[in-house]
């Protein structure tokens, strides 16, 4: 199994990226939270920490910003009822620090708000998260700081970030507007984008 891939970020879309390394293009599934951070790194060298899921007909790569995030994903998919898609949805909804806080507070409702997770699954997840997550992921100020940069126009910056992930301008405008309508006027881009992505996923699951 690969520990990481270092190469040129050549392509991004919602939930996926392509890294070119030694003439090969690796298609990797990754959390949208991280892809938004990478939107300014297109055609530059990046490091992706990978996890491989072996299926009957293919090997699927999942990518993360750090070994810690990858270990969290590995732990999540080891739980009953949680596959790679749901594991990514959890990491896409919550930062590592937030997930740790949720586990410590035993906030089942927060876990149940993740697309693809029902109340019963959330209750089962909480038992394991409460036991394992605080040891694996001590609170890290860097994880929070990476999402705290505030830019002049959250609306414009949010639309640009979603456009970099492949969303059309009308879709991006709608997603950002819906998210901002649920948040305080002084909400930061870091608060707006996860809500926009979450609401969009919920809408797709209902359709």
Curated annotation (Swiss-Prot):
Residues 155-207 are annotated as: Domain III. Keywords: Cytoplasm, DNA damage, DNA recombination, DNA repair, DNA-binding. GO terms for cellular component: cytoplasm; Holliday junction helicase complex; Holliday junction resolvase complex. One of its GO terms (biological process) is DNA repair. The keyword DNA repair applies. GO terms for molecular function: ATP binding; four-way junction DNA binding; four-way junction helicase activity. It is found in: Cytoplasm. Has three domains with a flexible linker between the domains II and III and assumes an 'L' shape. Domain III is highly mobile and contacts RuvB. Homotetramer. Forms an RuvA(8)-RuvB(12)-Holliday junction (HJ) complex. HJ DNA is sandwiched between 2 RuvA tetramers; dsDNA enters through RuvA and exits via RuvB. An RuvB hexamer assembles on each DNA strand where it exits the tetramer. Each RuvB hexamer is contacted by two RuvA subunits (via domain III) on 2 adjacent RuvB subunits; this complex drives branch migration. In the full resolvosome a probable DNA-RuvA(4)-RuvB(12)-RuvC(2) complex forms which resolves the HJ. This is Holliday junction branch migration complex subunit RuvA. It comes from Chlamydia caviae (strain ATCC VR-813 / DSM 19441 / 03DC25 / GPIC). The lineage of its organism: Bacteria, Pseudomonadati, Chlamydiota, Chlamydiia, Chlamydiales.
């Amino acid at each position: 199994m690969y520990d990481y891939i270092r190469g040129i970020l050549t392509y991004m879309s919602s939930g996926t990226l392509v890294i070119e390394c030694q003439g090969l293009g690796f298609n990797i599934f990754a959390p949208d939270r991280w892809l938004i951070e990478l939107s300014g790194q297109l055609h530059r060298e990046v490091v992706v920490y990978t996890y491989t899921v072996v299926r009957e007909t293919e090997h699927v790569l999942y990518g993360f910003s750090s070994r810690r995030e990858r270990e969290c994903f590995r732990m999540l998919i080891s739980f009953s009822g949680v596959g790679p898609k749901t594991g990514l949805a959890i990491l896409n909804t919550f930062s590592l620090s937030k997930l740790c806080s949720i586990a410590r507070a035993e906030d089942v409702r927060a876990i149940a708000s993740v697309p693809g997770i029902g109340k019963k699954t959330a209750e089962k997840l909480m038992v394991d998260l409460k036991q394992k997550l605080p040891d694996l992921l001590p609170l890290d100020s860097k994880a929070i700081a990476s999402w705290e940069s505030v830019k002049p126009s959250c609306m414009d910056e949010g639309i640009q970030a979603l456009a970099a992930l492949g969303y059309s301008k009308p879709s991006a405008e709608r997603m950002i507007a819906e998210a901002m309508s649920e948040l305080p006027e002084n909400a930061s881009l870091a608060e707006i984008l996860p809500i926009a992505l979450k609401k969009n996923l919920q809408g797709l699951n209902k359709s």
